[in-house]
Amino acid sequence: MEPLKVSGSGGIPMKTRLNIILEKSINKILIILGLLLIASTVITITLTVEYIRVENELQLCKMGAEVAKTTLEPPAQPTKTTPTLTSTRSTTATFKTRPVSRTNHHTNPSCWREEEKCQNITAKWSNCFGTFLPVRVNCTVLRELCDEQLGNHTTVQVSKRCTCIYALNWDCSYA
């Protein structure tokens, strides 16, 4: 490419030269601008969806902590003195969604659902920042938690963003 000559000396004027360059590359410029617009739109939508998801999880954690605070009760004293077989169940959630069975005994699957046979039920609710708040709950609350779910299991979900771990530990004695 030869250097531009000064106007009046027989060369192409600068304005005309720029117009020629723009005409040759206008399609490329429009494609690049379109791609930048699409990329910024995708990033904005992704960030908005992620923000809404995290906000929803924080609300669930706050609601769980409020439910736990309202269901405080003193430790239950066993009323029977007959020897019983005790099965201890401890359920925690990992970073994946997994089902947690509502039954823990093959011959008497609904034992823990009977009010007088549930003992030492403890629910641990996280406050989304890694510390747990152990509280006492009664069998009615435990039944309601499981009955809110569809099917025969309770689903526990944990997010990498908000470690909202909900764990149930309970003992169920069998006569």
Curated annotation (Swiss-Prot):
Region (Disordered), start-end ranges: 73-108
Residues in compartment: Intravirion: 1-28
TM annotation in the entry: 29-49
Glycan-carrying positions: N120, N138, N152
Membrane topology: Single-pass type II membrane protein
Any Gene Ontology biological process: proton transmembrane transport
Biological role: Viroporin that forms a ion channel probably displaying low ion selectivity. Plays a role in counteracting host innate immunity by inhibiting TLR7/MyD88/TRAF6 signaling and STAT1 phosphorylation, leading to down-regulation of type-I IFN.
Protein name in UniProt: Small hydrophobic protein
Gene of this entry: SH
